[in-house]
Amino acid sequence: MASQERVDSVTKGTGFRRCRKQAGYTPGTCELLRVMMKESKLTNFQQRHIMDTMKRGAPLPLQCNPTSSLRGSPSKKAASAIYLPPILATHSHLRPASLCQANGAYSREQFKPQATRDLEKEKRRLQNIFATGKDKEERKKVPHVRQEDPAPELDRFDELVKEIQDRKEFLAAMEALGQGRQYRSIILAEISQKLREMEDIDRRRSKELRKALATT
């Protein structure tokens, strides 16, 4: 029974001791630590020290001297000590409760009430359903906007008079700038065309007036 409780002293070709199953370290963790120690090229003393710590179930040391002779001489420079890889150091990743409370981890989400329905409007809607059997939404009365009377259309005869006057003023301005010869023929042709249109309007209106007088 005693031989079964003991762990095999040495693994072939490695010099690593097998660790007992402790509460703090699972067999998978022990195997991972063996591999990491091998890759980190730790001395035999450092490996034995770490394995003994694991068998006791104690936390792994943050640093380990390469030999036992340096254990009793802490006054020497810290450069002689070999620091363990970060994965071999056991650090708790749990945050303290005070830090969680400061970050609001324990604070409850405030209740935000949703928009309530208009009870009076719902009451009127139900009354309308009971009275008429139909669900009709109340329509807001849109104020009637009075439309302004459109501006009276400018008489075509008056438009022609204004257009002729504008062309006369333009031609006078060009004459003052010494460019009247360039625009004179164009402006006079347009004025002549508009005068003929005015004569046509005058004859048509005179004819309509005579017809109206004849029927009375």
Curated annotation (Swiss-Prot):
Organism superkingdom: Eukaryota
Coiled-coil segments on the chain, per record: none
InterPro entries per record: UPF0193 (IPR007914)
PANTHER family: UPF0193 PROTEIN EVG1 (PTHR28348:SF1)
Protein family (similarity comment): Belongs to the UPF0193 (EVG1) family.
The protein's name: UPF0193 protein EVG1 homolog
Species of provenance: Mus musculus
